[in-house]
């Protein structure tokens, strides 16, 4: 299944829905470009909903780690949520569950950001 994503933007948060298989940098180019564009526009809080992500390999994980590093270097945060069981097992095996901020749901991810920023991140 080909990788794709959609994004919903609020004033202070970019909410990404990832779908398909994230296996190579080429398929993630649009994601990286979109992310960097948001970051350059001053958006520093991101939620990546992985609910529809079918598969990710080490290259795909590397893409996510690169995005996480960029946002943290900018003083922000990237939270992943709705992680499928197989992908969660991969995060546990690689110990990336200690690197990424992982939430059970999109609402939980937004609440984490609200606590960090003391702001009114929209639930829409």
Task: Label each region the model flagged.
Residues 12-13, 77-78, 114-118:
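Long, contiguous secondary-structure blocks with strong helical propensity
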Residues 22-100:
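Amphipathic alpha-helical interaction surfaces in cytosolic regulatory modules
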């Amino acid at each position: 299944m080909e990788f794709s994503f959609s994004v919903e933007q609020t004033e202070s948060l970019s909410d990404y829905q990832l779908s398909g298989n994230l296996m190579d940098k080429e398929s993630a180019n649009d994601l990286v470009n979109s992310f960097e564009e948001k970051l350059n526009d001053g958006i520093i809080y991101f939620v990546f909903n992985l609910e529809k992500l079918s598969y990710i390999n080490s290259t795909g994980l590397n893409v996510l780690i690169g995005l996480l590093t960029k946002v943290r270097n900018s003083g922000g945060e990237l939270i992943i949520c709705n992680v499928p069981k197989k992908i969660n097992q991969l995060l546990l095996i690689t110990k990336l569950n200690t690197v990424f901020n992982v939430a059970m749901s999109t609402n939980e991810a937004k609440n984490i950001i609200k606590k960090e920023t003391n702001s009114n991140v929209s639930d829409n």
